[in-house]
Amino acid sequence: MMIAENAPFWRRKTLEELSQQEWESLCDGCGLCCLQKLEDEDDNSVYYTRIACKLLDLNTCQCSDYPNRFAQVPDCIQLTPGKADQFKWLPSTCGYRLVSEGKDLPAWHHLVCGDRQQVHEQRISQSGRMLSEHDVHEDDWEDHLIFRAS
C-alpha cells in the first residue's frame, strides 16, 4: 500500500527511519512510563502505580532532568525504535506503542491537535494524581496500583 507523501511522518516512515526529533516528538507527555511499576510474580503481569519517579514533575508530567536522567536514575528505561517489540508494557495510548503497532495517533495527541495540554485536559496523563517516590515507602507501593498494563 502506498502512503501519500503528505501523510504525517509517523504514518509514512518506519520507526527506524524516524529522525531523533521525530522519535522524541511521538512522546505525548503523559508521564505514565515514569510511574513505578510492579510485576506480579505469579503471572508476570505488570501493574502501574501512581508513584512517580523522583525526577518527574507531578503536574507537567515532564522529567525535571531529562538530559541527565540515566545518571540520576540508573534503572530509567530508554525507549528506542530498536526496542519496539518490548513496548507492550507501555499504556495502550502511548504514541511510541501505537506507531510501533502500525496504529494512528489519537485526536488529543499534540502532533495531531497542536496542543500539548490536551493529554492533561483529556485526563490521559496522571497530572495532579501522582505521588513522588520520595513520599511513599517502597513497601507501600502496592497500595497505590492504578491499572494493569495490557
From Swiss-Prot:
Superkingdom of this protein's organism: Bacteria
PANTHER family in UniProt: UPF0260 PROTEIN YCGN (PTHR37421:SF1)
HAMAP family, per database record: UPF0260 (MF_00676)
NCBIfam families registered for this protein in UniProt: PRK05170.1-5 (NF003501), PRK05170.1-6 (NF003502), PRK05170.2-5 (NF003507)
UniProt record similarity statement: Belongs to the UPF0260 family.
Protein name: UPF0260 protein PP_4587
